[in-house]
Amino acid sequence: MTKSVEGLVSVVLGAQWGDEGKGKLVDLLSESCSVVCRCQGGNNAGHTVVAGGQEYFFHLLPSGIVNPNVLAVIGNGVVVNLQALFQEIDEAVCKGLLDVSSRLRISDRCHLVFDIHQEIDRMEEELRGENSLGTTKKGIGPTYSSKVTRNGLRVCDLMGDWVQFTAKYKELVKYVKRRYPKLGINVEESLEKLSGMVCDSVILINKLVKSKQANILVEGAQSCMLDIDFGTYPHVTSSNCSVGGVCTGLGLSPSRVGRVYGVIKAYTTRVGSGPFPSELLDGIGEFIQKKGCEWGVTTKRKRRIGWLDTVVIRYAHIINDFNALALTKIDVLDDLEEVKIAKAYIDPETGRELDSFPSDSSVLNHVVVVYETLPGWKTSTHGCRVYEELPTAAKVFVETVEKLLNIPIRWIGTGASRDSIIIRSV
């Protein structure tokens, strides 16, 4: 890992529509970190890490917890489903992770996801019919709605007076005019499990930053194009997945954010509905989907496939100002005769190139995409660990992407395992 500026926090963010392979970069960078944090989202996120021959699926736990020397922090911007969290902890322990509970800290300001939120999520998606947003139905959006309307419940409420907590929960149910459901958790057992993990994460993180003794890494969930403000609204998630969410989701000053790393796939994927200019609806897309094992970690839904879209990534760069990029899954493209890169959008009515990323999804749905077409390399890149080992055409692909984006590509993923990665000195 590039040495962090003393006292500053490093951040890993997705620059497409999620599922870029952020977990792999976090796993690599966390080897030289002492603290890894989540700052937003909930168990609608899905990170996969392959370590020691074991495959781990993370939804709420920071994936950097795979490193046994890391303290994992779930920040105040995360919404927490306790059942899902405890199940994830149990599964991680069963797979051999050590001291998970003792290495985990949960902000007492985290809002709680209840079954009522999940039921609202399901019902709202059904009511939308063919205009559904394709949510994970995990109750994340309704929980953030409760937070914004100021009738949500937080971890600190659960840890406080139970009578008051019950009264607040009844008010929540009354507000959304739903029948009082069961919590679906054993409250006393949950309190016992939580007792050693809950803390004021704002104080904890800022003390660690000011001490200049902790190397802190923040792993973003979802991605910039799913950001509630900057994504392809309304087909977005309910939190800020961009660099601003790091500050609000952890209680950090912007001046504490040091390096920001973006993660992109060598192609593009998207789960659920929403505009997707470079989408492939032919046999090539189907081939990439199968070879890349493109199924949602959380939803198990088949991911939509498209060519790498540099218009999207340039827009994400404007918002996040990436210091460097990780390009993942280049090996999935090994068998293709040619590879395309989206480099511009044309307005079909005027014939002119758009000078900015459209905020209106209806406009984005109708843009004409301009592609750069490159020859495929027709040679396996799987497991390559040195840049010079890549076929010439694969290196041309990487360098063309760099040129179109004007951002250095420091890491190149060449397989699922944690050591299938090329680290470039750029």
Curated annotation (Swiss-Prot):
One of the GO BP terms on file: IMP metabolic process
Pfam families named among the record's database cross-references: Adenylsucc_synt (PF00709)
Enzyme Commission number(s): 6.3.4.4
Record text on cofactor binding: Binds 1 Mg(2+) ion per subunit.
Reaction catalysis annotation: IMP + L-aspartate + GTP = N(6)-(1,2-dicarboxyethyl)-AMP + GDP + phosphate + 2 H(+)
GO terms, molecular function: adenylosuccinate synthase activity; GTP binding; magnesium ion binding
CDD domains per record: AdSS
Binding site for Mg(2+): 19, 46
This protein's record includes keyword Iron-sulfur: no
Primary enzyme class: ligase
Domain of life: Eukaryota
Cofactor(s) listed: Mg(2+)
Binding site for GTP: 18-24, 46-48, 303, 329-331, 413-415
Chain sites annotated for binding substrate: 297-303
InterPro entries: Adenylosuccin_syn_GTP-bd, Adenylosuccin_syn_Lys_AS, Adenylosuccinate_synth_dom1, Adenylosuccinate_synth_dom2, Adenylosuccinate_synth_dom3, Adenylosuccinate_synthetase, P-loop_NTPase
SUPFAM superfamilies, alphabetized: P-loop containing nucleoside triphosphate hydrolases
Keywords from the named record: Cytoplasm, GTP-binding, Ligase, Magnesium, Metal-binding, Nucleotide-binding, Purine biosynthesis
UniProt-annotated binding residues for IMP: 19-22, 44-47, 136, 150, 222, 237, 301
Family membership: Belongs to the adenylosuccinate synthetase family.
Physiological role: Plays an important role in the de novo pathway and in the salvage pathway of purine nucleotide biosynthesis. Catalyzes the first committed step in the biosynthesis of AMP from IMP.
HAMAP family: Adenylosucc_synth
Full protein name: Adenylosuccinate synthetase
Source organism: Schistosoma mansoni
